[in-house]
Amino acid sequence: MQNQKIRIRLKAFDYRLIDQSAAEIVETAKRTGAIVKGPVPLPTRIQRFDVLRSPHVNKTSRDQFEIRTHQRLMDIVDPTDKTVDALMKLDLPAGVDVEIKLQ
């Protein structure tokens, strides 16, 4: 797997979960002898929703809700076969979305 790169992108609503998962991935990759670049924090995506409080009148009275999606990006340069096997066996929390691309 020489001259290849694994790009890992993590997404989660809770920044503590995503930082914990990123640290676990970095530790696993370094233990198997790969070079890790990152984690790089990407911009947080904020979705805002305005909802009327009243079912009938008072249009000016609203509740505001938001969902924040935190993202991290890391590159694993020159991964070995051990690195790939260790990453496949890694158990991450359920609230973290992981995208892995081989380049």
Swiss-Prot record:
Gene3D superfamilies linked: Ribosomal protein S10 domain
One GO BP annotation of this record: translation
UniProt keyword list: Ribonucleoprotein, Ribosomal protein
Highest taxon of the lineage: Bacteria
InterPro entries in the record: Ribosomal_uS10, Ribosomal_uS10_CS, Ribosomal_uS10_dom, Ribosomal_uS10_dom_sf
Coiled coil stretches, renumbered: none
Keyword Ribosomal protein: yes
One Pfam family hit: Ribosomal_S10
CC per GO annotation: ribonucleoprotein complex; ribosome
One Gene Ontology molecular-function label: tRNA binding
Subunit: Part of the 30S ribosomal subunit.
Family the UniProt entry places it in: Belongs to the universal ribosomal protein uS10 family.
NCBIfam families, alphabetized: PRK00596.1 (NF001861), rpsJ_bact (TIGR01049)
Task performed by this protein: Involved in the binding of tRNA to the ribosomes.
Protein name from the UniProt record: Small ribosomal subunit protein uS10
